[in-house]
C-alpha cells in the first residue's frame, strides 16, 4: 500500500441513499486499516448530516452510484458531492457494486472481531445501506491499489448518533475548531486562532488525526471521559511520569499506524514482466514497515518501565494489555530471526535505502547477497567519482547529495565556479547559491545502483513473505498498539503538555453529569487567552429551572466571544481535557448548534436573512433536549419588527424544550421574555461611558443593559448634526417611557412566579451537590426562611 505520508485524512468514502432519504456511508482509512459504517436519516434537504460526516472524515475519494439510472429522490448525495466537494475525486460505480449481501459477507470475513462480538446479525437490517457502501468501497480499493484485503485484519465499527456529540459543519466553522473563521474570509494565516492548532503539539501523525477527530466528534460516555481525566490528574501530579512518557513516546516511529497497512493488505501476484519501478517501490515500503515495526517493538520495554507504577485505570490498562502482552515479544522474536538487529529506521534517503537493502540477515538468500555487493560496489564507485572530480577540477566543496527521484547528483557552490563548468558536467541547474549537475559517468552508475537496490528490495520481499504471513496472524495486537500510541500521544503531548505551559490553576478538571446544571465559574476563551494575557473571565450557570440566557450588550462588548467560549469549554470537557475555568460542571451535550455571523451566501444564492433562516430551521428540526444552542443576533438582517417577531418566536420554541440556549441580542424587547417566562435569565456586558465614549469592561452582569442609547452615542461621535441627534433623543425618550411603563406592569404580574422558580433552581443545585446531609438540611432551612420573609 502506498502511504500518503501526511496529516490529511487518508479516507475513502462510499455513499448511497434510498427513497426514504436514508443515507449509508462506509469510510475506509487506508493508513490504519479501519472501516467505519454509518447509516442515518437526512432531516434536511441540505444534507447537513452527510456534510458533517464528510467534514469529519475528509475523504480523498468519494464513491457514489450513477445518477442516470437512479430514481427520483435517490441522487441527492451524488449531487451534493458535485456541488460541495468538487476538489475531491469522485468515482462513479455501477449500482450492482453496492450490494448489501456481499457487503455483509465481506465484513464477516475481513473483520478482526468475530461476527457475534461485532453484532453483525443485529446491525444487518439497520445498516444495510452502509454494508452496500462498504462492498463498493472495498471493491474499489482492491482494484485501484492492486491489493487484497487479508481476512480478519480490519477494525470495523458501526457508528450510531448515540456514540459521540454531533457538531454540524457550520458550527465547526463558527467555533473555529479546525481552521480560524477569518482565514477563509480574509486570507490571513493566523492558524493559532483555532482550537486544533492550539492543541496540535502531538508528535505522531496518528495522534494529530485522533485529536482532530475528537474535536469534531467529542465523547458522550461519562465513564470514558473520566478515565481520560483520571489519567490527566496523574500526569499533572506526577512530573516523573509525565516527562518519562513524553520521552519514551519519541522513541516510537511517527508513522506507527502506517505499519498496519502492509499487513492488512496483500499485494496481488504479478508476473516477472510486470515487475518494475512501481513494484520496487511497494517492496521498499513493505521493508520499511517491518523496520518501523521492529523499532516500535524495541521501545515497548522502555514504555513498560515508565508505566509500571502508574495508578490510573487508563495507564494501568495500557501496561497490562500492551506492555505485558506476550504476543509482542513473539512478533519481535520472529522479526529477529530474519531481520538484522543493527537495522534502524532512518529518514535520510540514502541511509534509509541502505538500511532497507541490508535489512535481511546475511546468508539467507544468495541472489540477495550478490545484489548487495553490486549495490555496495556502485555506491563506492559513485563516491570515488566525486573525489576524482574534486581533485581534477579543483572543486573542494563539491558535495554528493541523494534523493529518491534522481539518485545521486553533484552540488557545487556558485562562488567556486569561475566561468563555465567543464563539459563533463551535464544537466546543469542553478539552485539558490549552488549549482546542481550530473555527468554521464554518474548517470550510468546511478542506473546500476538503482537497479541493484531494486533487486535487493524484491529479493528481500520474497524472503519476507513467510514473516509477513506470521505477523498477519497477530494483526489485532498491532491494531491495539497503534491505537494506544495515538491515544497516549494525544493525552500526553497535547492535553498534558498544553496545560503544563499555562500558569498554575488556570485549567481545572471538569465534572460531567447526565442531568445536572451547566456551570462554569470564571471561564475563559481557550484560544483568545493564549493570545491576550489580560483576558477577562466570565461565568455561566444554566439548569432545568433556567435553560435560556439572553445576553445583551453593544457591538464589541464581548457577546460573540462569550458564546464561543461556552461551546469550546464544553467541547474540551467532553474530549477528556481540563478546561480554562476555576470550576466547571457540564451536563453532557449530544449536539451543539450555532447561529453566528452575518454574510450573504453567494454560492447558494442566499441573502444574509435567508442564510439565518436556513440555519435556524436546521436547528429547529434537529434540536434535542440535551443540545446546547448559541444564537448571535438572530433577526437583525431584516426589518426590526419582523426580526423581533422571529427572534421572540424562536426563543419561545426553544424554551419549550429542555435544551440549554444562550441568545445574544441587541433587541431590548427580548429582555421582556424574563418577565413572562421564569426559566429565562437576562445578562448584559457592562460598559462604562466616559466623555460620550464607550469603555468596554467585558464583564458579564445580571439584569438588562444599562447603557442609555449607545447607538446615539456612536452616531454623535461619528459626526451627525446636533439637531438630528437632539431630535432622535426626544423621540427615543417618548418610546422608552412608554415601553418602561408596560414592562413594569408585566414585571409586577410575574413577580411571584419568578420567586417560585428561584426556589426551584436552588433545590436543583442542592440535588446535585456533594454536601453532607447536615449541610443540605441547613441550606433548606435557610431557603425556607428567605422565601417566607420575601428575601428571595
Curated annotation (Swiss-Prot):
Gene3D superfamilies documented for this protein: 1.10.1420.10, MutS, connector domain, P-loop containing nucleotide triphosphate hydrolases
List of residues binding ATP: 553-560
Function: Involved in meiotic recombination in association with MSH5. Required for reciprocal recombination and proper segregation of homologous chromosomes at meiosis. Promotes homologous recombination through facilitating chiasma formation during prophase I. Involved in the control of class I crossovers formation.
GO molecular function, one term: ATP-dependent DNA damage sensor activity
GO CC terms, sorted: condensed nuclear chromosome; germ cell nucleus; plasmodesma
Protein's UniProt name: DNA mismatch repair protein MSH4
PANTHER family membership: DNA MISMATCH REPAIR PROTEIN MUTS FAMILY MEMBER (PTHR11361), MUTS PROTEIN HOMOLOG 4 (PTHR11361:SF21)
Alphabetized SMART domains for the sequence: MUTSac (SM00534), MUTSd (SM00533)
DNA-binding is among the record's keywords: yes
Pfam family, any one: MutS_III
Tissue: Specifically expressed in flowers.
Main location: nucleus
Any one GO biological process: homologous chromosome pairing at meiosis
Keyword annotations from UniProtKB, A to Z: ATP-binding, DNA-binding, Meiosis, Nucleotide-binding, Nucleus
Disruption phenotype annotation: Normal vegetative growth but severe reduction in fertility due to a decrease in chiasma frequency at metaphase I of meiosis.
